[in-house]
Amino acid sequence: MDHISLIGFMGSGKSSVGKELAKLLPSMELIDLDSYSEAMTGRTIPEIFENEGEAAFREMEKSALQDIFMTGELTGASYILSLGGGTVTSEACRRMIRRNSTCFYLKASIDTLVHNLETWPGDRPMLKGGKSLRSRVEELMTARGPIYEKTAHHIINVDGDDYTAAAVDIVTLK
């Protein structure tokens, strides 16, 4: 397995750790699945959520992931994949991730996630719904936490926000 997949909740530092990994592993291309999906469809993720719903987005996300792994297989390229926080909610995506990459769960506490999401809010459709940010994060993490752990080959604690150290740990474990 030449690919590295980074999974974890929104705000866990997948993009930041991915950038650090790309510096340490210059032969690997960093791909952000959300950005790849937007380029593939010509629409933003919030637009897809708003116009077609979460199920349509998850299907599109699965197609994008298949495309990336197929391209890697055909070209021999190796990728660092920064996956969306909900990518692992699809059984098909979980199987693809585990079969085609070494998967790292960037595990962060609720406090760290809330802090990071308040600092870098972005447009995150899954956090909408009238509840407080903390209660929505807690609700989603209750459902997703066990899935992240089950999907990952390795778990990296990122509560210290030292993304370079997390990237070094990943290179060591890879």
Where are the regions that the model predicts?
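Pre-Walker A (Motif I) flank of P-loop NTPase domains
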Residues: 1-4, 76-77
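Short glycine-rich anion-binding loops that position phosphate/pyrophosphate groups of nucleotides
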Residues: 84-88, 109-111, 161
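A glycine- and Lys/Arg-enriched "phosphate-lid" helix/loop adjacent to the NTP-binding pocket
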Residues: 99-145
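NTP-dependent small-molecule kinase module
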Residues: 4, 16, 20, 115, ...
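P-loop (Walker A) phosphate-binding loop of NTP-binding proteins
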Residues: 9
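ATP-dependent small-molecule kinase phosphotransfer cores
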Residues: 35-87, 91-98, 125, 138
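Conserved glycine(s) of the Walker
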Residues: 13
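Post-Walker A helix-loop "phosphate-sensing" segment adjacent to the P-loop in P-loop NTPases
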Residues: 23-31
